[in-house]
UniProtKB/Swiss-Prot annotation:
Keywords: 4Fe-4S, Iron, Iron-sulfur, Metal-binding, Oxidoreductase
PANTHER family, sorted: PYRUVATE SYNTHASE SUBUNIT PORB
Cofactor binding, per record: Binds 1 [4Fe-4S] cluster per subunit.
Name used for this protein in its record: Pyruvate synthase subunit PorB
Organism from which the protein derives: Methanocaldococcus jannaschii (strain ATCC 43067 / DSM 2661 / JAL-1 / JCM 10045 / NBRC 100440)
Keyword set includes Cytoplasm: no
């Protein structure tokens, strides 16, 4: 088996304020290992922004700008246009490929920042958008987002005898972005770092708008021990709850197919946000995932 050689350079410094076992920090570290120093980051308000930039400190060793919840993609669009103008009018960076990358959580991407993201994709800006998906507004107190999974409990979708947690299915952001007709979209998970890094490398080699949705388990919001972050992510993929695939120029491809999908029960039972589920609830979720996987060819 050929193992990918990870770059030794670190452009995401240690010492951030993230929780022990934080998945968002892994997203940033792996992303920058591929993107390298010639990168400009726009970062929406959220966990990653708050934990990496407590004034006057920063974990970012590349140019970085904090944006509001709603405009990371719009800011990246402006930076991309400015870089093009500087190259054209002043000859600056003429011999360099500058990577413009926007990063936002699921709340800042699928909800509050969706309009700006859709506009940036539709206009064809040469940017990469990374959605780090921890499936709720974790920074502000674990409120539900449109990326919160069906029946997961949050502070605004609590579980009780009548309401079984979140009552809506998780928004399929990657397929929504694919519907924009952009050249590259993909899903990834921090528990499969080689898959994620290959997708980042491919995305940055393609001209035009790109989108990658990265599942990153959250020890605080999901309710599991910090040392289980990678295991939880693997179970999300092995059960088919979060499939790994890419769509390049309209061509769909599964990038990891479990030899035999594990029961969703193994994934759900490890997390406190699902502790209210009955056997009937779990069977309902299993049926939904089975149908989804059949549609994708898993």
């Amino acid at each position: 088996m050929i193992v990918m050689q990870f770059p030794r350079e670190e452009y995401f410094a240690p010492g951030h304020r993230g929780c022990a076992g934080c998945g968002a920090a892994i997203v940033a570290r792996l992303l920058l290992k591929v993107a390298g120093k010639d990168t400009i980051i726009t970062n929406a308000t959220g966990c990653l922004e708050v934990m990496t930039t407590p004034y006057p400190e920063t974990s970012w060793r590349v140019p970085w700008i904090h944006t509001a919840f709603e405009n990371a993609a719009a800011t990246a669009s402006g930076i991309e246009a400015a870089v093009k103008a500087l190259k054209r009018k002043r000859g600056k960076f003429a011999d360099k490929k500058i990577n413009v990358i926007a990063i936002g959580g699921d709340g800042g991407t699928a909800d509050i920042g969706f309009q700006a993201l859709s506009g940036a994709m539709e206009r064809g800006h040469d940017i990469l958008y990374i959605m780090y998906d921890n499936e709720a507004y974790m920074n502000t107190g674990i409120q539900r987002s449109s990326s919160t999974p069906f029946m997961a409990a949050t502070t605004t979708s609590p579980a009780g005898s009548k309401i079984r947690g979140e009552d809506r299915p998780k928004k399929d952001m990657t397929m929504i972005m694919a519907a924009h007709g952009i050249p590259y979209v993909a899903t990834a998970c921090i528990s499969y770092p080689e898959d994620f890094m290959r997708k980042v490398k491919k995305a940055l080699s393609i001209e035009g708008p790109k989108f990658i949705q990265v599942l990153q388990p959250c020890t605080t919001g999901w309710g599991y021990p910090p040392e289980k972050t990678i295991e939880i992510g693997r179970l999300a993929v092995e059960t088919g709850i979060f499939p790994l695939y890419e769509i390049e120029n309209g061509e769909f491809r599964i990038t990891y197919k479990p030899a035999k999908r594990k029961p969703v029960r193994e994934y759900l039972k490890m997390q406190k946000r699902y502790r209210h589920l009955t056997d009937e609830d779990i069977e309902r979720i299993q049926k939904y995932i089975d149908e989804k996987c059949k549609l994708l060819g898993l």
